[in-house]
Amino acid sequence: MPQLTERSAWAYKFEWTDDHLTPEQAEPLKHSYDVLAEECLNRLNAISPPQRGTLPRTSNTNPTPVRTEGTDAENKEIYPVPQRDLYALLKEHHTSDAKLDELWQQVNTIPDWVDWEQIERGQDVFYRYGGPALTGLTFQSLLGGMGAARVVETLARTGGFNTKVARRRLFETTQHILQCTRSLEGIKPGGEGHASSVRVRLLHAAVRQRILKLAETKPSYFNVKEWGIPVNDLDQIATIGTFSSSLIWLSFPRQGIFLSHQEIEDYLALWRYIAYILGTPDTFFTTTPKAKAIMESLFYNEVHPSEMSRTMANNIIISLKETPPTFVSADMLTASARWLNGNDLSDALGLKQISLYYWALMAGQCLFFAVYCYMNRLVPAWDRDHVRRAKVVFWDVIVKAKWGLANEETTFDFKYVPEYDTLTELGKHEERKVTRSAIESRNLRTFAIFAGASLVVLAAGTYASVKVASRILGTLW
């Protein structure tokens, strides 16, 4: 039996086992990466060179429109520059290049350990707890993940988390998650989630390649020796962990949601398969103990907030406050972050202090989610209907709605291009414009109902206890 040692990281306590990675054991993973994807990216760039002049997303996320020659009527029309689809290029040209075919065969080969029924159950887990899942992914996995100072250095150099574009980038990431979860066919080879995962894999290769090229001519731009290769294997493992393990053992429990053993195994199986498509070492997610151990190892070893961590975390709050569809205030967003990450980590990330009022709103939200999710889980028919409706609503809000991606699905092309002068800066907080959002009002009502019900139960219990005690004393005397 291995000797267990209790450790703590940011108010999270756990037992250190042989499955956990020490910093020394994790070090090689900082310098290894997806070589095959980068080799294929070079070939795809030769076949279809990326558009020149694609700049970092600092204020505008849309391709520059162009005019075409034609009739007077046609000349009045403005046509956007088409996005380059690396997945389509790979699909079209893999038969004419051995290296491209190697990648194509790899991503289209189903590992022996994949059980499609289990994968589908894992997809349903995401929607069964959809509200807490999106809350956890935003405020614990993403915002709290900004505490990993080493990883943040790569994100900061893309410019994709300044306040003007962070919200859209978050929606694009959510689009990928939804494509991987809203249907079983979508995650199978040729499906929308499968294709997007391949695109993201090649995008990671492009970011890595760009940063390393800049660092060659200006070593101070990115410290490879200290931070490792950009978008390395350890970073990729951490990313999969934030979408899976962190939800299971951090975000969900802190919102009063506890998955069954079967749900945990199913959800991990889904993300292990996504990791495989992304070119991420998936052996760390083969069992529940391993998946939990790698999350805890990275939480313990990697989360040490820097000044850039504070900038990125606060930019997420600024970019999301008072925006549709929720119109939630900055204080409510901060309450969500503090509830899910704890005060110690939140203080280290430079998040503002909030009043008890917003703590009460967050408590109300957790109560609402817990009751709603558990009630649906109790009745299979309700659960199926809830999952079905959640798939439609999430897609409509994130992808179709004008305040989301406006029905323009991203192909994960290389738009956050690192440059020497690209570094994410802290945005400015402005005065609140919306009095109170519907979400905040709902949370307040829920908290008030539960608080009132608790007082009634407490009063009734006290009254009953007094009556019983009186009768007992009466018989004794």
Model-derived regions, located:
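Mature, function-bearing regions of proteins
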Residues: 1-477
